[in-house]
Amino acid sequence: MKYALIDTANTFFRARHVVRGDLDTKVGMAFHITLNSLKKIWHEFDADHIVFCLEGRSWRKDFYEPYKRNRQEFRDALTPSQQEEEKVFWETFDAFKEFVTTKTNCTVLQHSQLEADDLIAGWIQLHPEDEHVIVSTDGDFAQLISPKVSQYNGVSTVSYTHLTLPTSRSV
């Protein structure tokens, strides 16, 4: 079995930075890149099943207070129009999440204390004999790449395998 493991928020939110333009264009591009990434994985990598991994609050914050603290500072510094864009993107993402949860046969994983990368790593551990394609721009996934695990960056359309490991700046 070959699983496509989607770092869903990463894929969706990174895609909006690919194009300049109005909010509708950015939202449309986020959908386009996310869905095209899935189509490419399905066809080129011959995936059998898609697993959407969704964000929860990280357990790491309970042990290391500064963990991702700069993200809140970044959000606090947004202009009103950027705040509106952020709000619309989260609303759109929630609608996408609802769609894949209720209208597809894809697996959807979410836990209140785990980030998507935790869920992806856990899924791979639970299915060691299967093949996995991680869809994400996150360079931290390089540590999971092996003969049975590869990574596809849906924004740059670059794939990494155990034979072509990414550098820290290339993902």
Protein language model annotation of sequence segments:
Residues 161-167:
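Conserved small/polar residues in nucleotide/adenosyl-binding loops
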Residues 2-133, 141-158:
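Noncatalytic, basic helical substrate-engagement surface that gates or grips nucleic-acid strands
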